[in-house]
Amino acid sequence: MPVAAAVVLLAAGCASLGSVKPEDAVKQRAENYWKARAAGQVDKAYELTSPSYRKVRTFDQFKMQFGNAAGIRGASVVKVDCEPEKCTVRTKVETTPALMGVSVGTIATHLDEIWLLEDGQWWRYQDI
């Protein structure tokens, strides 16, 4: 009898892992992406791009494109809309542009980004 109870509890635990809503999972990963970018942790941001992107773009190429040209001060996910294998995330990003000799302060903008389900995980889509 104790073995049967353990099997039931194990099955219930595994089932609960799959019950995370795509919107919640994507929101968390998008927040992690922007936290990494704001902290200058380009390697962590790169790890959240899709495996198919990483097959054709190296970390150094990603870093050249998305290094610290504009200082990201903060970001917050505003909205997540999901289809079965694609989510659109609207994120408010606050940046301090690096303009030589000009101080423009912090600028806030909203970005729409795509997250794709690939190999059972959500990844940030990045144009090549």
PLM regions: where:
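Sec-dependent bacterial lipoprotein signal peptides
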Residues: 1-16
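Non-catalytic interaction surface on structured domains
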Residues: 10, 19, 119-123
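Exposed beta-sheet edge and beta->alpha loop/turn motif
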Residues: 83-128
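Solvent-exposed, acidic/flexible segments
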Residues: 22-27, 38-39, 55, 86, ...
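Short, low-complexity N-terminal intrinsically disordered segments enriched in polar/charged residues
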Residues: 14-39, 47
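Short solvent-exposed beta->alpha transition segments
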Residues: 42-83, 88-90, 97
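Alpha-helix termination/capping residues and helix-transition junctions
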Residues: 8-11, 39, 69
